[in-house]
Amino acid sequence: MKQYLDLMTRVLAEGTPKADRTGTGTLSIFGHQMRFNLQDGFPLVTTKRCHIRSIIHELLWFLNGDTNIKYLHENGVTIWDEWADENGDLGPVYGKQWRAWGTADGRQIDQLKTVLEQLKSDPDSRRIIVSAWNVGELDKMALAPCHAFFQFYVADGKLSCQLYQRSCDVFLGLPFNIASYALLVHMMAQQCDLEVGDFVWTGGDTHLYSNHMEQTKLQLSREPRSLPKLVIKRKPASLFDYKFDDFEIVDYDPHPGIKAPVAI
């Protein structure tokens, strides 16, 4: 994961001080890309420990179309707590947009089922895309989508994915985002009888919060370790039938965790 540390170094060296919605302040760059060959290992940051349980359960929650934090709480995941209302609701965030995008004529589009069908029937299509950026519902969301738009690409029997992330918290959020989408690519590839290819991450406003600087420097002082491997223990009937226990991350040997405040 040297690419991730290189991004941190770039933000520290080139970042512009900016105000932000949370009032915390950031160092920010605009436009950055990283490419991870998923054949080389699972791209989970090793210079600090990442909470794998949260990454997996959050993705399963998205895939279920859920937008209430009850499932997350039942599974010991608290990463969405700061944005939920008193009933645990978040409004029409990722799960709603991925699984039930509302149309003007009252229909709902399951974008994930659609892309699965496309990958199987027309893998050369240039329209295999999922968007969470529903302009008509942004004002109803507790938090506008940060990882907003992703596209799949098939070549030589391998499935690749590119994500556009409009806003990126490099220290806290990005390790989760990379691992989450890498996991999704593995799941989609298994369902479509493909090998995994590349995960390409593209960032818009890519920033370090001002209260993450010491943590960032600590992380940069650490040497990256070998990437772990992802094992998927079974092939469920569909993308939506995976369970937490279907996944195992093996040979993950990270440095200790580093705590940092969340900007809300």
Swiss-Prot record:
Signal peptide bounds: none
Localization annotation: Cytoplasm
CDD domains per record: TS_Pyrimidine_HMase
Keywords on record: Cytoplasm, Methyltransferase, Nucleotide biosynthesis, Transferase
Endoplasmic reticulum among keywords: no
Active site: C146
GO MF annotations, alphabetized: thymidylate synthase activity
GO biological process, one term: dTMP biosynthetic process
Residue positions binding (6R)-5,10-methylene-5,6,7,8-tetrahydrofolate: H51, D169, A263
Biochemical pathway: Pyrimidine metabolism; dTTP biosynthesis
Catalytic activity: dUMP + (6R)-5,10-methylene-5,6,7,8-tetrahydrofolate = 7,8-dihydrofolate + dTMP
EC number: 2.1.1.45
Pfam family, one: Thymidylat_synt
GO cellular component: cytosol
Gene3D superfamilies listed in its UniProt record: Thymidylate synthase/dCMP hydroxymethylase domain (3.30.572.10)
Chain positions recorded as dUMP binding sites: R21, R126, R127, R166, S167, C168, D169, N177, H207, L208, Y209
Main localization (coarse): cytoplasm
Subunit: Homodimer.
Family: Belongs to the thymidylate synthase family. Bacterial-type ThyA subfamily.
Function: Catalyzes the reductive methylation of 2'-deoxyuridine-5'-monophosphate (dUMP) to 2'-deoxythymidine-5'-monophosphate (dTMP) while utilizing 5,10-methylenetetrahydrofolate (mTHF) as the methyl donor and reductant in the reaction, yielding dihydrofolate (DHF) as a by-product. This enzymatic reaction provides an intracellular de novo source of dTMP, an essential precursor for DNA biosynthesis.
Protein name, as recorded: Thymidylate synthase
Name of encoding gene: thyA
